[in-house]
Regions:
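Generic structural motif recognizing short loop/turn segments at the entrances and edges of beta-strands
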Residues: 61, 89-95, 127-133
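Amphipathic, interaction-prone secondary-structure segments
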Residues: 77-113
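Assembly/interface hotspot detector across virion components, adhesins/toxins, and nucleic-acid enzymes
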Residues: 4, 83, 121-125
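Short, compact, well-ordered microdomains
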Residues: 102-140
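Non-catalytic accessory regions used for complex assembly or targeting
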Residues: 2-21
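Acidic, low-complexity intrinsically disordered regions
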Residues: 8, 50-52, 58, 66, ...
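An N-terminal amphipathic alpha-helical segment
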Residues: 21-92
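Residue-identity detector for glutamine
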Residues: 11, 18-19, 48, 93, ...
């Protein structure tokens, strides 16, 4: 078995920071220069890329961005403050979202899944019919 050295850990940290900086540059450039919806209201490849590369430190911003391009959000997007399962004295921001079967919203869900850290730390539940529940701690 290979022993993990201090130098190896430092190299991994540097590579991680470089990748993170490159992804932030891509997101910032796309947000500044590209259309997020096409002429029919579907999320563009640029929008899906932004969702899949969004930095994990900004969960609230991720949901704000996705909501801004979500089709039928008056019907399929609901936010609420709910008690946290544990500890009970804390609260979470809950996002109940439904795709309404619309392929544009389904493409956003797929882009969200590609952002594996964000998905793993916010996803709570999926149900048949395109219904999803996500939560973020209110202290984030």
């Amino acid at each position: 078995m290979t022993k993990v050295t201090k130098e190896m850990r430092e190299q991994w940290r540097i590579e991680y920071e470089q990748q993170k900086a490159a992804e932030k540059l891509i997101v910032d450039t796309l947000l500044a220069e590209e259309e997020m919806l096409d002429e029919d209201g579907y999320p563009t490849v640029a929008a899906q890329t932004v969702v899949s590369l969004w930095p994990w430190e900004d969960k609230k911003g991720w949901f704000l961005f996705i909501e801004s391009i979500w089709h039928l959000r008056s019907w399929g997007w609901h936010e609420s403050t709910e008690p946290k399962e544990y500890p009970k004295d804390k609260t979470v921001q809950r996002f109940d979202i439904s795709t309404a079967g619309w392929s544009g919203n389904e493409s956003l869900i797929h882009a969200m899944e590609k952002n594996s850290f964000m998905w793993a730390t916010t996803w709570v539940q999926s149900r048949r019919g395109g219904h999803y529940i996500f939560e973020i701690d209110n202290d984030e």
